[in-house]
UniProtKB/Swiss-Prot annotation:
Protein name listed in UniProt: Phylloseptin-O2
GO biological process: defense response
Record gene name: psn5
Naturally occurring in which organism (per UniProt): Pithecopus oreades (Orange-legged leaf frog)
Keyword match Zinc-finger: no
Predominant subcellular localization, coarse grouping: secreted
Length: 19
């Protein structure tokens, strides 16, 4: 589960970069 946290952060970071 902990491995999923960094993955979610990476997704949010990508979305923020796209915005």
């Amino acid at each position: 589960f902990l491995s999923l946290i960094p993955h979610a952060i990476n997704a949010v970071s990508a979305i923020a970069k796209h915005s």
